[in-house]
Regions:
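Acidic, polar low-complexity linker/tail segments
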Residues: 1-15, 23-29, 46-47
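Structural motif
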Residues: 13-15, 111-115
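Short beta-strand/turn micro-motifs composed of small residues
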Residues: 18, 55-57, 116-118, 139-141
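Short acidic, Gly/Ser-rich segments with clustered Asp/Glu that frequently serve as metal-coordination loops
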Residues: 20-31, 121-125
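An active-site-proximal "capping" alpha-helix that borders the catalytic cofactor pocket
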Residues: 31-54
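Von Willebrand factor
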Residues: 61, 69-112, 121, 139-148
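VWA/integrin I-like adhesion module and closely mimicked acidic/polar interface patches used
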Residues: 120-165
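C-terminal "exit" segments of structured domains
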Residues: 168-170
Length: 170
């Protein structure tokens, strides 16, 4: 008898950090981001990727999902997502860095990806955690006066940068 080992490609984990602070309410930024996230969740489901979802709003970041397979249950969360409160994005990035490190030890073959959705409206930051995985920062800042901090944040996170308007026009 011959036994054949199943060859499986390593699982993918998509870590999504969503800035849902009050400033993302302006100019329909969060609404458009929700449409983009709905598409992302559908793609994750089709590709059988695992998702980790961290929301940065209020005073502390909150984990919604940690490493589960994408499912239709995320649609309920997405529909209820609203903007408000402060911007604990830096705390969310810190938590994400710690969580990814632990996860990497537990699942060394897993391919991790990072997506940060933010308007970048932070007062200041220093010493961002090294997340050590490919990343994309989607800038949802809109309006006549743009601070442009999301691009700087992407550079410091060693992530690619894309403005949401460029993605919507595709």
């Amino acid at each position: 008898l011959l036994f054949q080992l199943r060859t499986r490609t390593p699982h993918e984990l998509w870590l999504v950090i969503v800035d849902a602070s009050a400033s993302t309410r302006r100019h329909q930024a969060l609404s458009d981001a929700k449409g983009l996230l709905a598409q992302l969740f559908d793609d994750a489901y089709r590709q059988r990727a695992r998702l980790a979802l961290l929301t940065a709003s209020g005073s502390v970041p909150k984990w919604q999902v940690q490493g589960l397979k994408a499912s239709s249950g995320l649609r309920v969360w997405l529909d209820a997502l609203g903007a408000g409160g402060g911007t604990p994005l830096l705390a969310a990035l810190e938590q994400a860095g710690q969580w990814l490190t632990v996860r990497r030890k537990r699942f060394p073959a897993e391919q991790q990806r990072l997506l940060v959705v933010t308007d970048g409206r932070l007062k200041q930051w220093s010493g961002l955690p090294a997340l050590r995985c490919p990343g994309l920062l989607i800038d949802i800042e809109r309006g006549p006066i743009r601070l442009g901090r999301a691009k700087d944040l992407a550079t410091e996170l060693d992530a690619q940068y894309q403005h949401i308007d460029e993605l919507i026009s595709l």
